[in-house]
Amino acid sequence: MLFPTPLVEGRLVKRYMRFLADVILDDGTAVTAHCANSGSMASVKEPGSPVWLSESPNPDRKLKYTWEIIRVGDAYSGVNTGTPNAVVAEAIAEGKIPPLAGYARLRREVKYGKTSRIDILLEDDAAADDAPARPRCYVEVKNVTLKRDPAWDGPIDFPDAVTTRGAKHLLELADMVDQGHRAAMVYLVQRTDGGAVAMAADIDPAYAAGLKTAIAKGVEVYCLGCEVDPLRGIWVNRALPLIAP
C-alpha cells in the first residue's frame, strides 16, 4: 500500500483520549492529529518519538492530520488500525499469501453472522468442468504492534488490551467453519522488527484461550510482517510463525 501523498514528519508530544495525538511538526507547528487506534498502544506512543502524519485534502475535516507511523528505536511501526485491512487485501490480490490466493472475488466489510462484518470475504466461481467452487473464506485481520522483548527478532504480542470484540470474532470464525466455509485470522505485524507473533495471555487470557479453541475447530491462522517506509508506504514482506497459545 503506497501513500497517495507524502507524509508530514514531526515529533510526538502525547497521545490522549484514545483518538487524539499532539505533534510538533518539523517546521515547529503544533497540531492535533487523529489517532485511528483504540488500543493501549503500549510500546508505540513514547513522547518525543519521530512520527509521520497523513494530510487530508478535505478542507471541512475537523482534524487535518492522521497519525500513520512512529519510529521506535531503529524500527518503524504503523499505528493506524485502518491500514491492515488494505495491506492484507493487497497482499491477497498479489498472491503473497498462497493459501488465500486465486479466489475470483475479494470483498471487504461484508455483513455476516448476526450483527458483524467480516474484514475480507473471498469467493470463487464454479470450475469450468462443473466442479464445485472452493468454499467461501472469511478473513479477519488484526493489527499487531506490542513489543516487549528487546531483541530485534523478538515476538510481537497481541492483544495490547483486553478485547471482548476480538474474542467474539474468533467465535464467529469458528461458526463459519462449522457451516462448511473456510475462516482465517490474519495477524499483521505493522512493524519492521519482530520475528514471531505471540498471544499476550497475561493481558487477555480469554482471547488467548479463544484462539486455541478456534484453531482446534479449524480456523486458519496467518502471521505476516511488514515493510513500513515513511517515504513510500506499508506492505507485506515476510511470513512469521505463531508461538502457540
UniProtKB/Swiss-Prot annotation:
Disulfide bonds: none
A Gene Ontology molecular function term of the record: DNA binding
Regions annotated as coiled coil: none
Domain of life: Bacteria
Cited Gene3D superfamilies: 2.40.50.580, 3.40.1350.60
Protein family (similarity comment): Belongs to the SfsA family.
Protein name, as recorded: Sugar fermentation stimulation protein homolog
Source species: Rhodospirillum rubrum (strain ATCC 11170 / ATH 1.1.1 / DSM 467 / LMG 4362 / NCIMB 8255 / S1)
Primary gene name: sfsA
